Amino acid sequence: GTATCETQRLANFLAPSSNKLGAIFSPTKMGS
């Protein structure tokens, strides 16, 4: 239904952001 569609869109929107944040913060953690 619409709820599933909304959740899917939200996941698609947040996933790339999480990957970018992970790429930024992971080297910082490993560096320190």
UniProtKB/Swiss-Prot annotation:
Q: Which GO annotations describe the biological process of this protein?
A: amylin receptor signaling pathway
The terms describing its cellular component in GO are: extracellular region
Q: Where in the cell is it found?
A: Secreted
Pfam family example for this protein? Answer: Calc_CGRP_IAPP
Keyword Secreted assigned to the entry: answer is yes
Main localisation: secreted
Q: Which GO terms describe its molecular function?
A: hormone activity; receptor ligand activity
Q: Gene3D superfamilies per the record?
A: 6.10.250.2190
Entry keyword set: Amyloid, Hormone, Secreted
Q: Which InterPro entries does this one have? A: Calcitonin/adrenomedullin, IAPP
What function does the entry list?
A: Amylin/IAPP is a glucoregulatory peptide hormone that plays an important role in the regulation of energy homeostasis. Selectively inhibits insulin-stimulated glucose utilization and glycogen deposition in muscle, while not affecting adipocyte glucose metabolism. IAPP function is mediated by the CALCR-RAMPs (AMYRs) receptor complexes. Amylin can also bind CALCR receptor in the absence of RAMPs, although it is more selective for AMYRs.
Complex and partners:
Can form homodimers. Interacts with IDE and INS. Interaction with INS inhibits homodimerization and fibril formation.
Q: What family is it from?
A: Belongs to the calcitonin family.
Q: What is recorded about the domains?
A: The mature protein is largely unstructured in the absence of a cognate ligand.
- What is the protein named? Islet amyloid polypeptide
Protein species of origin: Ovis aries (Sheep)
Q: Which gene encodes it?
A: IAPP
